[in-house]
């Protein structure tokens, strides 16, 4: 079975949410590992546990609270996922990406993705923020794509383009906003590569990924972006560099999830402030003009 959900399942979940909240979000934000604190910045917040939302999967990873939060961020109507779903939790990609299609049916036109990632680019330091310019869908090389199976034209075309997956205008606005913030470290920009996980990468794998042109590596984000672009959503996103990958066989260091969460905690406030400021740069929907 390529997709266990029908169009009616997505629609029923969207209608349930619309009937349980007065919020009508324009922007959806997916909070990565340790980045759920962004929800604290929402005003008029309304919270739903994933468990109470029809058809919603459950989040099982430390650092992912498993809550959907509606509210306003810097004046912009938002819905935030405080915890995402991953392949390594045993979820098929159609389940990992379920919320994105629901957001589309809620009227969302922009998706912001954030994640914790390992730095492959030797210029990156722990705590850096990388603006995602492009991605490499490594699981896709072996047939793992969230759009696999029959296409539903009500969501989008059979063969969506991915050459412009990350909105160019929003990337330019992010770069100029960062300069205005006067941060000491420059905003990095690069390519994110997704691996399936949950095991961290070997030294040999890190070397291969670097040769492929990847700047940061993680275990999420790409499936949601593919489905969002299929639905016609504007997408932009950021990786918080929480560790530098191990490229040396002589190194005694080991990657671990606790380290990722700790590094994320230190740098998360900077990313949260940045995303909040950027909300004002997102074009208003046509119907509001």
Curated annotation (Swiss-Prot):
<feature type="binding site">
    <location>
        <position position="33"/>
    </location>
    <ligand>
        <name>phosphate</name>
    </ligand>
</feature>
<dbReference type="GO" id="GO:0034418">
    <property type="term" value="P:urate biosynthetic process"/>
</dbReference>
<protein>
    <recommendedName>
        <fullName>Purine nucleoside phosphorylase</fullName>
        <ecNumber>2.4.2.1</ecNumber>
    </recommendedName>
</protein>
<keyword id="KW-0660">Purine salvage</keyword>
<comment type="function">
    <text>Catalyzes the phosphorolytic breakdown of the N-glycosidic bond in the beta-(deoxy)ribonucleoside molecules, with the formation of the corresponding free purine bases and pentose-1-phosphate. Preferentially acts on 6-oxopurine nucleosides including inosine and guanosine.</text>
</comment>
<feature type="binding site">
    <location>
        <begin position="84"/>
        <end position="86"/>
    </location>
    <ligand>
        <name>phosphate</name>
    </ligand>
</feature>
<dbReference type="GO" id="GO:0005829">
    <property type="term" value="C:cytosol"/>
</dbReference>
<dbReference type="InterPro" id="IPR000845">
    <property type="entry name" value="Nucleoside_phosphorylase_d"/>
</dbReference>
<dbReference type="GO" id="GO:0047975">
    <property type="term" value="F:guanosine phosphorylase activity"/>
</dbReference>
<dbReference type="GO" id="GO:0009165">
    <property type="term" value="P:nucleotide biosynthetic process"/>
</dbReference>
<dbReference type="GO" id="GO:0004731">
    <property type="term" value="F:purine-nucleoside phosphorylase activity"/>
</dbReference>
<keyword id="KW-0963">Cytoplasm</keyword>
<dbReference type="GO" id="GO:0005576">
    <property type="term" value="C:extracellular region"/>
</dbReference>
<feature type="binding site">
    <location>
        <position position="201"/>
    </location>
    <ligand>
        <name>a purine D-ribonucleoside</name>
    </ligand>
</feature>
<comment type="similarity">
    <text>Belongs to the PNP/MTAP phosphorylase family.</text>
</comment>
<dbReference type="GO" id="GO:0001882">
    <property type="term" value="F:nucleoside binding"/>
</dbReference>
<dbReference type="GO" id="GO:0006139">
    <property type="term" value="P:nucleobase-containing compound metabolic process"/>
</dbReference>
<dbReference type="GO" id="GO:0006149">
    <property type="term" value="P:deoxyinosine catabolic process"/>
</dbReference>
<dbReference type="GO" id="GO:1904813">
    <property type="term" value="C:ficolin-1-rich granule lumen"/>
</dbReference>
<dbReference type="InterPro" id="IPR011268">
    <property type="entry name" value="Purine_phosphorylase"/>
</dbReference>
<dbReference type="GO" id="GO:0006955">
    <property type="term" value="P:immune response"/>
</dbReference>
<feature type="modified residue" description="N-acetylmethionine">
    <location>
        <position position="1"/>
    </location>
</feature>
<dbReference type="GO" id="GO:0006157">
    <property type="term" value="P:deoxyadenosine catabolic process"/>
</dbReference>
<keyword id="KW-0225">Disease variant</keyword>
<dbReference type="GO" id="GO:0042102">
    <property type="term" value="P:positive regulation of T cell proliferation"/>
</dbReference>
<feature type="binding site">
    <location>
        <position position="257"/>
    </location>
    <ligand>
        <name>a purine D-ribonucleoside</name>
    </ligand>
</feature>
<feature type="binding site">
    <location>
        <position position="88"/>
    </location>
    <ligand>
        <name>a purine D-ribonucleoside</name>
    </ligand>
</feature>
<comment type="subunit">
    <text>Homotrimer.</text>
</comment>
<keyword id="KW-0597">Phosphoprotein</keyword>
<dbReference type="GO" id="GO:0034774">
    <property type="term" value="C:secretory granule lumen"/>
</dbReference>
<dbReference type="GO" id="GO:0009410">
    <property type="term" value="P:response to xenobiotic stimulus"/>
</dbReference>
<feature type="binding site">
    <location>
        <position position="220"/>
    </location>
    <ligand>
        <name>phosphate</name>
    </ligand>
</feature>
<dbReference type="GO" id="GO:0043101">
    <property type="term" value="P:purine-containing compound salvage"/>
</dbReference>
<dbReference type="GO" id="GO:0042802">
    <property type="term" value="F:identical protein binding"/>
</dbReference>
<dbReference type="GO" id="GO:0070062">
    <property type="term" value="C:extracellular exosome"/>
</dbReference>
<dbReference type="InterPro" id="IPR011270">
    <property type="entry name" value="Pur_Nuc_Pase_Ino/Guo-sp"/>
</dbReference>
<dbReference type="GO" id="GO:0006148">
    <property type="term" value="P:inosine catabolic process"/>
</dbReference>
<dbReference type="GO" id="GO:0042301">
    <property type="term" value="F:phosphate ion binding"/>
</dbReference>
<dbReference type="InterPro" id="IPR035994">
    <property type="entry name" value="Nucleoside_phosphorylase_sf"/>
</dbReference>
<feature type="binding site">
    <location>
        <position position="243"/>
    </location>
    <ligand>
        <name>a purine D-ribonucleoside</name>
    </ligand>
</feature>
<comment type="pathway">
    <text>Purine metabolism; purine nucleoside salvage.</text>
</comment>
<dbReference type="GO" id="GO:0046638">
    <property type="term" value="P:positive regulation of alpha-beta T cell differentiation"/>
</dbReference>
